[in-house]
Amino acid sequence: MVNNLNEHKEIEFGWFLPTAGDGSYVGVASEREPTLEYLIDVAKAAEKAGLGFVLIPTGGPCLDAWVVGSAIMSHTTTLRPLVAVRPGLTTPVLSARMGAALDQLSGGRAMINVVTGSSVQDLEELGDPLAHAHDKRYERASEYLAVMQQAWTQSDGIKASEFVGSEGAETKQNDQQQPFRGKYYQFTRAVTTPLTVQKPHPPFYLGGSSPSAKRVAVEFADTYLMWGEPHDWIREQIEDFEVVRSQYREETGIDRPVRFGLRAQVLVRDTEEEAWAAAWELISKVSPEAIEQAQKAFAKTDATNQRRQNELREQFKDERFVVGPNLWAGLSLVRSGGAILIVGTADQVSERLIEYAELGVSSFILSGYPHLEEAERFGKEALPLFHQKWASRREVRA
C-alpha cells in the first residue's frame, strides 16, 4: 500500500513543447511547423497558464532541445526549460558545461532530462554502439551522471573572467579530488565546469520502468518520471521503485529523496460527451495503414515503459481503449511515449490528477493537441480546480 507521499510537497506542473510540429490531429502530417515564433507562443502560453516548466523532446524529427531551450528561456521570465542529455552521444563534461551555461544565462532555470533512448532506430541513426544493449545504456548513464555531478560539485568552477587555459583551470582543482575512472569514462584529471546558479546543480529528471532504470533514478534523479498508466499500475510502479530505493539505502546508507513525475495528455471540454468526441476526433484522420506501421515500430522497442504502453493498449482494445475513469489509450495507436489521455470536464480531469497526486506523484508533465490552445484551456479551467481541491484536502489532513 502506497502512503500519501506528498504530504509536505508542492505539486509542479509542466507542459510539452511540440518541436516536431503541432496540430489538431495525431498520426498525420503536422498542420503547424515548429517555427521559432510558434514555439515561443506555446512557451509563453504555458507560462501564463501557471505551468512552471516545459519538456523539450529529443530524437527523430524534433528540433535540438538545447537550441530550443536557449531560445525560449530568453523570451520567458519564470518558465524553466527541461532539456535532454543523451548519455553516450555527447561527453558528460561537455553536457555539464552546456547545462551550466544554460543555468547561468537563464538565471537558474535549467532542468536536465536524462534520455537513454527507447527507439532502436533513432539510436542506430545516432551511431550509438549500445543501440541494442538496453541495460548497458543505463550502466553507461550511471557513469555519465556521476561525471556530470563531479564536474558541477567538486570544483570551484571556471568563471568567465578567469579563463586562462587548461593550466589556469587546473590551479582551481581541489587537491583531494580523484579523476573519475569507470568502465565507460576515464579521466586523467578531475573535471571542471562553469558554476551553476542552482546548488548543488540543476535537477535531473529520469524515466524508465525497467529495474536498471529505477536503480539509476534512485542514485541520481531528483524526479523519477513515469508515462501515464491507470492508477493501479502507477501505484505498483511507485511501490517497486520504493523497494529499489530501500535496497540502495541498505547498501550505501544514503537515503535520497526522489519525487515522482507523470507524463500524460489532457483534454478538457465543457461536458464529458464533448470531451470523448474530441478525443476520438484526434485520431479520426489516421489511416489503417498508418496505424499498422506505427504498431510495428512500437513493437521493436527494447524500452520497458513503451512495452507497458503497448500492453495497455492491447489489453483494453475491446473496451475502446478506455483504461479507467476518464483515461484513454487511443492515442497510443499512433503515438509513442506518454500517450495516455486524461479526458473529461475540468472537474473530472482535475480529480484524476488529484488521485495520481494522492499516490505520490508531485510532478506532472502534460500536453494536448494543439499545444497552444490546450495549454490555455488547461491553465484556465482545470489547473485552478486542481489547486483548490489539493489545498482543501491538505487542510483536511492537517
Predicted features along the sequence, with ranges:
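An alpha-helical appendage that flanks or caps ligand/catalytic pockets
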Residues: V2-T19, V120, L126-G127, A133-Q198, ...
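Glycine-rich, proline-tolerant flexible connector loops at the mouths of alpha/beta enzymes
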Residues: F53-I72, G228-W233, L366-G379
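Hydrophobic faces of well-ordered beta-strands that scaffold small-molecule active sites
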Residues: I11-W15, V54-I56, R80-V85, A110-V114, ...
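N-terminal beta1-alpha1-beta2 module of alpha/beta enzyme domains
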Residues: M1-T78, D135, S161, E167-T171, ...
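Active-site mouth loops of central-metabolism enzymes
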Residues: T19-E37, R86-V93, A131, Q198-S209, ...
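Alpha-helix-loop-beta-strand connector modules within alpha/beta enzyme cores
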Residues: A65-V83, R140, Y144, Q247, ...
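Conserved, mostly hydrophobic/aromatic
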Residues: F13, A46, G50, I72, ...
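Acidic (Asp/Glu)-rich catalytic clusters
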Residues: L5-H8, K44-K48, S70-T78, G99, ...
